[in-house]
C-alpha cells in the first residue's frame, strides 16, 4: 500500500471522526483523517469545551461578586480580567488538541489539513495550503459535523449579528445581548455573559426554553436564569 493509499479515509476530525480513526487503527486498518480547520472539530474548539470553560469561570466570578457574602466571606472589590478568562479557555482547548495529536501519533493515523472532497469512488482529494493531494481509500467515512444555523432575517455580519463561535471569543463584555434561540447553546451563551455583567434577553419561538425538555424542569431553569439576570421572552421572534 502506497503512502497515500489507506484502508479508511475519514473527512472530519471532530468527535465522530477522530474517535473512529483511533478505533479503526486499533482494529488494524491504515487510516487517514482530513479536516480543513480544527483538529477536534467544533465541539472541542468553538463549542462544547470552550463554552463549559467559560461557564465555570463566569460562575466563579458571579459567586465571588454576589454570592459569597451570604457565607460570611468578604472579598472586597472583585475585578474581571476577561483576557485572562479567555486565555484559560484557550489553554484548555490547546491541551485537548494536543491530546488528540498524541492519540493520532500513538495509533499511526495520518492527518491531512485541507478540504476533503470525494472525487470518485475510492478517491479523496485534499486541497491544502501546499496544493492538492489525492488519497486512495478502500472505505470513506464522512464525519463533517455541523455549523451554526444562519436565519434568513438575521444574517451573520460578525459584528451586530454573531454566531456562537464569535460569542465565545468576545474581547469585552457587551452592555446588552439578545440571544435568538432558547436551546442549550443559546442559554449557555446567555448565562455566561449575564454573569459577567451583560443585560441578556433570550428570544425563543416556542412556548418554553429548551423545547422538548420536561416542562417543569425548563420552568425551574428559567427561574434560575432570571435570578442571574437572564430574561426569557417566549413565543417570540427577532429580526434586525
Could you describe each region identified by the protein language model?
Residues 2-6, 22-29, 34-173, 206-210, ...:
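Glycine-rich flavin
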Residues 2-14, 173-183:
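Beta1/beta-strand and adjacent pyrophosphate-binding region of the FAD-binding site
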Residues 7-33, 186-194:
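N-terminal Rossmann-like FAD-binding beta1-loop-alpha1 element of flavoenzymes
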Residues 9-11, 32, 142, 178, ...:
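Conserved hydrophobic packing residues within short motifs/helices of P-loop NTPase cores
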Residues 28, 197-199, 229:
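Glycine-centered short loops/turns at secondary-structure junctions
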Residues 83, 202-206, 233-235:
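Short beta-strands and strand-loop turn motifs
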Residues 171-213:
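Rossmann-like NAD(P)H-binding beta-loop-alpha module
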Residues 185, 189, 217, 221, ...:
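Internal, well-ordered alpha-helical segments in soluble enzyme and binding-protein domains
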Amino acid at each position: 500500500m502506497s503512502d497515500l493509499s489507506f484502508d479508511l479515509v475519514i473527512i472530519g476530525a471532530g468527535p465522530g471522526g477522530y474517535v473512529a480513526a483511533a478505533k479503526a487503527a486499533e482494529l488494524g486498518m491504515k487510516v487517514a483523517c482530513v479536516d480543513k480547520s480544527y483538529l477536534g472539530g467544533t465541539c472541542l474548539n468553538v463549542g462544547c469545551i470552550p463554552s463549559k470553560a467559560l461557564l465555570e469561570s463566569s460562575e466563579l466570578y458571579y459567586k465571588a461578586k454576589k454570592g459569597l457574602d451570604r457565607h460570611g466571606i468578604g472579598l472586597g472589590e472583585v475585578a474581571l480580567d476577561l483576557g485572562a478568562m479567555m486565555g484559560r479557555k484557550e489553554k484548555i482547548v490547546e491541551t485537548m488538541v494536543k491530546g488528540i495529536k498524541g492519540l493520532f501519533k500513538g495509533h499511526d493515523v495520518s492527518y491531512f489539513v485541507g478540504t476533503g472532497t470525494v472525487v470518485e469512488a475510492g478517491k479523496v482529494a485534499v486541497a491544502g495550503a501546499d496544493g492538492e493531494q489525492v488519497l486512495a481509500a478502500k472505505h470513506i467515512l464522512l464525519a463533517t459535523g455541523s455549523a451554526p444555523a444562519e436565519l434568513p432575517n438575521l444574517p451573520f455580519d460578525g459584528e451586530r449579528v454573531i454566531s456562537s463561535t464569535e460569542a465565545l471569543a468576545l474581547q469585552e463584555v457587551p452592555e446588552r445581548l439578545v440571544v435568538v434561540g432558547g436551546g442549550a447553546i443559546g442559554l449557555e451563551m446567555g448565562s455566561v455573559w449575564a454573569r459577567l455583567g451583560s443585560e441578556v434577553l433570550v428570544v425563543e419561538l416556542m412556548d418554553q426554553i429548551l423545547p422538548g425538555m420536561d416542562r417543569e424542569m425548563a420552568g425551574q431553569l428559567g427561574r434560575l436564569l432570571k435570578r442571574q439576570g437572564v430574561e426569557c421572552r417566549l413565543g417570540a421572534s427577532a429580526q434586525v
